């Protein structure tokens, strides 16, 4: 009789969320990554997306601090499309916060600057730090994009 083994591929993701849903731990991580020394966890405005219905996207932890819209995500598989996924997450975060807030005004609506950090803990050999850019996916990468 052969038994089948079920592998839980989301345990690392859940552990990351459990640890860093605590504002004090999240602030400590932010300070370690940025070299800042924030002391008050209540300054964090947590705005994590649990499930974006139409895309079935989830993020691990997102928050606003000091005019930065931060998105932290843990991945055990390298994905060169991570910047595109981040673009979708940020669009939804901004939509939730700013939809209906005078976006048709003649005055510029200032928004927090996006910062997307992915923590890789997979088995493939990867550098300690690797920058991925959304523009790397553009079909005409040398052409300056304008919105």
Regions found by a protein language model. Name each.
Residues 1-147:
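Accessory alpha/beta interaction modules
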């Amino acid at each position: 009789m052969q038994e089948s083994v079920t592998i839980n591929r989301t345990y690392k993701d859940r552990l990351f969320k459990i640890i860093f849903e605590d504002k004090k731990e999240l602030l400590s991580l932010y300070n370690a990554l940025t070299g800042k020394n924030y002391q008050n966890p209540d300054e964090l405005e947590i705005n994590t997306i649990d499930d974006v219905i139409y895309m079935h996207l989830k993020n691990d932890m997102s928050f606003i601090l000091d005019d930065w819209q931060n998105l932290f995500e843990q991945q055990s598989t390298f994905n060169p499309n991570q910047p595109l996924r981040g673009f979708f997450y940020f669009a939804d975060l901004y939509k939730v916060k700013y939809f209906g807030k005078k976006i048709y005004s003649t005055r510029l609506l200032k928004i927090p600057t996006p910062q997307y950090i992915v923590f890789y803990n997979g088995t493939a050999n990867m550098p300690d730090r690797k920058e991925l850019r959304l523009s790397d996916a553009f079909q005409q990468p040398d052409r300056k994009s304008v919105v």
